[in-house]
UniProtKB/Swiss-Prot annotation:
The lineage of its organism: Bacteria, Bacillati, Mycoplasmatota, Mycoplasmoidales, Mycoplasmoidaceae. This is Tryptophan--tRNA ligase. It comes from Ureaplasma parvum serovar 3 (strain ATCC 700970). ATP binds at Q9, P10, T11, G17, N18, G152, Q153, D154, I191, K200, M201, S202, K203, S204. A motif ('HIGH' region) lies at residues 10-18. It comes from the Bacteria. It is found in: Cytoplasm.
Length: 333
């Protein structure tokens, strides 16, 4: 069975985009892959504005959300990134074989560097962790020698660098790493902001009215969906070019009902946007209410911490063996 790995940062609240773009897919994939899911707490340090307020609680809630969504701890290994000390060790090894040019070419680094603030000495405050983020991500993947990595389009370039680094290591020190393949779901891989369908729905959005959080109440969900940007065509049709707002709402609808875009179009061909939005709001609200109840169960269950400890032990054993092999091939061991 091939191995799949992915992580999510424990910052603020998870969104419906996080669920539909990642968590839901993990649930579907765990029957076909050996799945490793981690809370990427080390990546949370990247912006250099780390807020540790209730951080341990937030991390725990991420695991509870995975379980509530249907992740089976017997099939999937759930752990905290910071508990696996082999990861930062491998990250340093990979960093030493990565050029500055490779890191500065990363699109995310370029985009976020533009927003950097000027300091008193006229230099820009660009955290070094932002530059080295891709090598830590590569270590996350290669520490477990994963075959498959589900990533959004915004992370695809980082995975390509991971493959490059793995191949470079193999050629220099001998066959050690697999070259991980990208997995991008056809539907729901990227849920967009309700108010601006040109940007991804994000928990760090400046306007939270365009973001549905997993802990939103029914009233808030209805307000956000009713206020979602559409167009003046008043026709429920999937067209990313002419109707990006409606297409985004249809993607959410399709992911939660398993209906195709064509089936949704036929269902609402005689209906206006008001009816469509009301139905979608009910679907989202009903789904999140059930999910919230399951999350609450896990947060209050002593089984949660026992499960995390057991999964962490398993992850550490695998990571240690893999990185020890790396050290051996480099003759550092």
């Amino acid at each position: 069975m091939k191995r799949l790995i992915s992580g999510i940062q424990p910052t603020n609240n998870l969104t419906l985009g996080n669920y539909l773009g990642a968590i839901k897919n993990f649930v579907d994939l765990q029957d076909d892959y050996e799945v490793f899911l981690f809370v990427a707490d080390l990546h949370s340090l990247t912006p250099n504005i780390f807020d540790n307020t209730d951080f341990s609680t937030t991390k725990r809630q991420i695991i509870a959300t995975y379980l509530a969504a249907g992740i089976d701890p017997k099939k999937t290994c759930l752990f905290y990134q910071s508990d696996i000390l082999s990861i930062p060790l491998l990250a340093h090894i990979l960093l030493c074989s990565t050029s500055i040019g490779e890191l500065t070419r990363m699109t995310q680094f370029k985009d976020k560097s533009i927003k950097a603030t000027k300091m008193a000495n006229n230099t820009e405050m660009i955290p070094s962790g932002l530059l080295t983020y891709p090598t830590l991500m590569a270590a996350d993947i290669l520490t477990f020698n994963a075959d498959v990595v589900p990533v959004g389009q915004d992370q695809k370039q980082h995975l390509e660098l991971t493959r490059t680094l793995a191949d470079r290591f193999n050629k220099r020190y001998g066959n050690t790493f697999k070259l991980p393949q990208v997995y991008i779901p056809k539907i729901g891989a990227k849920i967009m902001d309700l108010l601006d369908p040109n940007i991804k729905m994000s928990k760090s959005s400046k306007n939270l009215k365009g973001v549905i959080f997993l802990n939103d109440s029914k009233d808030i969900i209805f307000k956000k969906i009713k206020g979602a940007l559409t167009d003046n065509l008043n026709k429920v049709k999937y067209d990313l070019t002419l109707q990006p707002g409606v297409s985004n709402l249809m993607t959410i609808y399709a992911c939660l009902t398993n209906l195709s875009f064509k089936e949704i179009e036929l269902k609402y061909q005689q209906q206006n946007y008001g009816v469509f939005k009301n139905d979608l709001a009910n679907i989202v609200a009903d789904f999140l209410e059930k999910l919230q109840q399951k999350i609450s169960y896990w947060l209050n269950s002593p089984e949660l911490d026992i499960m995390i400890d057991n999964s962490c032990e398993r992850a550490n054993d695998i990571a240690y063996q893999n990185v020890q092999l790396v050290l051996k091939h480099m003759q550092l061991k």
